[in-house]
Amino acid sequence: MTMNSKRQWLKFAGGSTLAALAVSSALVGCGKKEEAAAPVAAPASAAVVTKPEPLKVAFAYVGPVGDGGWTFAHDNARKAVEQEFGDKVVTSYVEKVPEAADAERVFRDLVGQGNQLIFGTTFGYMEPMLKTALDSKDVKFEHATGYKQTDNLRTYDSRTYEGAYMAGVIAGKMTQSNTLGVVGSIPIPEVIRNINSFALGAQSMNPKVKVKVVWVNEWFNPPKETEAAQSLINGGADVLMQNTDSSAVLQTAEKNGKYAFGWDSDMTAYGPKAHLGSAVINWAPYYIASVREALDGKWVAGAGKHAWWGVKEGAIDMVSIAEIVPADARAAVEKVKAGLKDGSFSIWKGPLLAQDGKEWLKKDEVADDKVLSGINFYIKGVEGKVPGGK
């Protein structure tokens, strides 16, 4: 029954009741006084179903949504949340939020707007999010790539080093100069892991390779990324990987007739001749799972509540591998994927040497997540020094 038909029924019912009361009154007036008419009950009101208010979910991004990389991947996942839950959620985002003191203002503003679940998508939001969370106990917070948690703040990450390893497998096969290059963003464990993993993947196919690194100390700065990529090419690198957010590295490789990989998102379109494959992150499975927990009242935070998803969970992949990549490299990538999914393969299994030649992992020793979370040095085969590290 539509709302209009409900209103018409109530109008009809009300009119009929009044008519019935009038007739009863007339009959009482003509009959015995002791036979008063029994009171007529008013019609029951139609049951009103109250629709639950949608869950308000907000995202804070360090870069623009159109960066083609990191932020683009997060925003695609936000859209996937909307598609999954429909009118049960309302999402919003703020882009280009700097990793600085002003980030706290942004998070407090998101709280003030009534958001119930807030995602901060870069490492530098850690302290601003923690401060805001401690003052906003009725709001749920999730911080990407961080490590500090509290009762209403938990952390999550993707095993991007798995994508870096697969890129290394391809790079080790494709290089002619045996020199690979990486444009690094911020020298934190997350990025250092990726550089080392890229080197290990390359060494698995070509023990002669060496890896050079140029740091730009920013996540998104296309001019700096371009300059760094050109510097690596000038230094002999013929295959590049990046841990930055724009497509500048791939575009620079294309202009120079070299090879490169997409990072975080599929970047094929930005340099189709240079593109060997893209190490992508799919944040959608995690965001959908987290929002579902919040909707179902099962969302839990606290010390140790950290999710770290990779190939196994469908969060990491190597996609759009170029046709020029040889069959044996393609097969090696697929073997790595299968091993990561079923746990039969570990990237961080000894014997592995640090850059200075000292043993880091003994034979068959496997670095656990705690060790990987604090890595601040290069492995053997990576040149240069980690800024502020070893």
Across the structure, where does each feature detected by a protein language model lie?
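N-terminal export leaders
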Residues: 9-10
